[in-house]
């Protein structure tokens, strides 16, 4: 993760699930569908690289015996261990961590791979995926879709969002800019929280085209079995499907989802 990255939600991981609720279990449903499609038998182990608060792992733990997570941020690791003590959570850099074992499923969600800004960062992260995979392991990753941002109408300079829950109320304004040569998206987000000083986030993300993601995974020993720009496995031209709804993250409908098996 770039050292200039800062986020209210990294400082306060307890707020993450309020800001980004998953009441309909969309991500868990996608994963379970992928297991049925791309694995010969139900998985017995899963590693989530960039696991955040461990919410997805907790969902998957109802049917998967061994659920491991890795996150770069000590704040996320501490929160996940406190709230979800049954999970096996480790702190580490996705470019370098080695757990000394393999898993039936390796996942990397929430744009975590998009934090790998350079080609070498991307390669090293995929090497981490491969180090924890055996032949037939299913890899599931999502990244920000360069087609949507650079070629289509997915780029919006200014996006507003609202969080209105009993525990947390705030509005946000996200300002985006593109570096086309390096295929990077930069986002500055300002939180307006009643009765508190404004809080400013900053992040940079690497944008990947579908063919780049496919080649990256192939070079790391994975064969892509499916790639979509949605969680419903609908075949499209991978240009991205844009939501017009207010969006705190500013990235809804702008992702690629890849499903690949270790050779």
Model-derived segments and their meaning:
Residues 95-105:
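A short acidic, Gly/Pro-enriched loop at the edge of an enzyme's catalytic core
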Residues 136-143:
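Conserved beta-strand signature within the Rossmann-like core of class I S-adenosyl-L-methionine
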Residues 207-263:
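C-terminal lobe and adjacent flexible extensions of AdoMet/dcAdoMet transferase-like proteins
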Residues 143-215:
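SAM-dependent methyltransferase
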Residues 123-135:
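A short glycine-rich, Lys/Arg-flanked "PGG" loop and its adjoining helix->strand segment in the class I
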Residues 1-50:
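Conserved class I S-adenosyl-L-methionine
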Residues 54-96:
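Class I SAM-dependent methyltransferase SAM/SAH-binding core
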């Amino acid at each position: 993760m770039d050292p200039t990255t800062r986020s209210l939600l990294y400082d306060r991981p307890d707020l993450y699930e309020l800001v980004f609720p998953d009441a309909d279990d969309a991500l868990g449903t996608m994963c379970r569908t992928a297991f049925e499609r791309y694995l010969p038998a139900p998985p017995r182990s899963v590693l989530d690289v960039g696991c955040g608060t461990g919410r997805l792992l907790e969902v998957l733990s109802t049917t998967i015996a061994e659920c491991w997570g890795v996150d770069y941020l000590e704040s996320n690791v501490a929160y996940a261990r406190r709230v979800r003590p049954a999970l096996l959570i480790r702190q580490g850099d996705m470019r370098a961590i080695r757990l000394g074992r393999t898993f039936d499923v390796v996942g990397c969600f929430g744009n975590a791979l998009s934090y790998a800004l350079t080609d070498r960062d991307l390669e090293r992260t995929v090497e981490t995926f491969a180090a924890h995979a055996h032949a037939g392991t299913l890899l599931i990753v999502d990244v920000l879709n360069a087609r949507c941002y650079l070629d289509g109408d997915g780029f919006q300079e200014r996006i507003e969002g609202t969080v209105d829950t009993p525990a947390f109320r705030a509005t946000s304004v996200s300002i985006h800019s593109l570096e086309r040569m390096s295929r990077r998206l930069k986002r500055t987000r300002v939180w307006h929280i009643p009765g508190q000083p404004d809080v400013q986030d900053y992040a940079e993300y690497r944008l990947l085209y579908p063919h780049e993601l496919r080649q990256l995974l192939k070079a790391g020993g994975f064969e892509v079995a499916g790639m979509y720009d949605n969680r419903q496995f609908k075949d499209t031209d991978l240009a991205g499907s844009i939501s017009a709804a207010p969006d705190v993250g500013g990235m809804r409908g702008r992702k690629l989802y890849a499903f690949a098996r270790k050779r």
